[in-house]
Each structure stands twice: as C-alpha cells, then as structure tokens.
Amino acid sequence: PAAQQVELTASGEGLDLANINDPDNFNKVRLSADTAITLQAETDIGELYLVFDRPVEWRLETADGTEQACGQNGFIHEYVELEQPASTVTLHLPADTVLCEVYAFTPGQVPDWVQQWQPPCEKADLLVLPTHADDEHLWFGGTLPYYAGEKGYAVQVAYMTNHWGEPYRPHELLNGLWTVGVRNYPVISDFPDLYASKESLESARQVYNEEEVTAWQVEQLRRFKPSVVLGHDIDGEYGHGAHMLNAATLLSALEMSGDAARFPESAEEYGVWQVPKCYLHLWPENTIQMEWGEMPLAAFDGRTALEMAAEGFACHVSQTQWFEVKAGGSNDCRKFGLAYTNVGPDEAKNDFFENIPSAFGGPA
C-alpha cells in the first residue's frame, strides 16, 4: 500500500521544532549538546525521512525501549524504516548535529521524492568524476539519466571537491542525482571547493596537492573497478583550473591503477584495476557524439536524456543563474573522446559501452 505522510508533533528541550518538516533547508535546528527529540503522531509511523547538513550517527528509540542504530552510511538525506512501527519515537542526536527536516509516513510505499539511497556501488559499470556539484549535468549531459535512470547500470558518481562550506549545495547535489535516476550514494572527497583554484591549472596546483588528488583518483578506480570512466575536458570546459586538474590527474591515475606499487595503500584495500576505457568531455581524438536530445527515456515518461539533464541541473538552485545545460556551443555536453582504451577504438560511436562485453565486467 502507499504510505501516507503523517502530521508530527516534535519536542526537544529548548528547541523550536515548529518548522522541522518545512521543505526549506534554511530552517535548521542546531544542537549544541547531545539531544533527544521526541516525535509523536496520531497513527503508527512506519518510515522516517531526515535531512541533515552533515553526516551524523544517531539512534532511534521507540516507546518500548527498542533501539535502532542510524546514520551508519553517512547519508545526509536518510530514509529509515522502523523495525517496529510506533506512534511515538525518539531521536537521540549528538552535539553539533544540524537537522533540517523530518518527515514521517505510515507503513507502506513512500512517495518517489523520498530519497532511499543505496550505499556506493560494490562494482560500477560507469564511474563519473565531476569536480563540483552540477558539473555532472552541465558537462556530461544525459549520461546519468540514460545509463543510470533508463538502462539501470551501476553508476557511481565521485566528486573531486566538496561543498560543506556552502551547506545548501550538498542538498542540491543529492536532489539532482536523485532526479536523474542515480540511486547509489555519491562519493564526496575531502578536498574543499576553493575559489582560488579557478583561474588556471597552475592556480589549482597551488591550492590542491596534485599527488593527493592523483592518489584519490587511483583509489576510486580501484574501489569501484569501473568498465567505463567519464571525466572532464582537459582544458577545463570554460577554463576552470580544478576541472583541468581533475582530468590531468585522472589520465595519470589510469596508468597507475593497475600497478600495486603505485599508491600501495589503496591497492592493499581494494586490489588493483586496469580500466577498460575512459572518455573525456571534448577530447579531440576518437570522438563520439551522444545525441542526448534524441533519446526519449521510458523511465522518465518519454522525456529525453537532455531534458532530464536540464531537470537535474535545475535542482542546483544556487547555480542556475550562471549556467545552463547545452547541446551545441563550445562546451557541447554531447561531445566526448575516447582518451584511454584497453579494448580498442570505437566503431559505432554511439555508446560509451561499445566493446565492453558483460564477460569483461560490463553491465549484465
């Protein structure tokens, strides 16, 4: 049965929780100490959906004293199914938690807008490596709606920088991925988004340690063992130094990920991996043009992959005045080149997975 959203009464010592299920992430509750928040409803709650500003481990307690450990996966948009439905539940949250929203539902199938994230892929068919939140839609176009949403491939997104300093952006990031059909939670690196990295490759090298970024790239390749990797334009699209550094370190990492002597820590943890093929946006050799605007997707009621890329980008409310998803122009989101291959050149040039048989670790 379909779950119904239930009205909640929320209480916690000294807290104003009146707006806690207002879908405006700017109404936040900041906890200065370990805090218990009690939620009461007139009917049994079967599921909760919570939005935090940062990952947090917490406990859920029902009236009979049953406890559930939550937040183990580090998701800031967290769906919780109660082991035993109850009309009163208590959230035990640690100091420094920033809680934005809480929604409760009767037992059953929750609405589609509730993000039920899966952990990152065990093995990815496709690994996509944007630098900042929104790059995945702007420069890679219909890639995510087509391969994740429509084809159901295991698609892992890993961001080279984080936006914890601008707390609204991680929410935009997750909302955009969810909108285009990605269901495996993204990897978000420990490298902060730094404005000083923008001007040139050299400026990016001054604020990021290139060796550390390369190690991070190698780790992603070994961890997710992708059949296909997708990265930025080596010239940084509109010339962004951090995009350039991302592409340059990725090209280096592709040569190292199969060698256990390079960055041995991640080799020990994940084993080594030789990537079959990697495309870069706008790479001038072995070019391929993905006609996202001519790909209607049944998973999205016939909207095209290009339309869905624009819909994903529209979730990045703080960025929409600066950019738009475009097929055409100098940063055409349809144009890619095969920058690295262990499976030969493309012939048909209409699918990133050309020459990737399922026996070679491609999609089943």
Residue spans for each PLM region:
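The feature marks non-catalytic terminal segments
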Residues: 2-29, 41, 52-58, 62-64, ...
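Active-site beta-strand->loop->alpha-helix modules in alpha/beta enzyme cores, enriched
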Residues: 12-58, 64-263
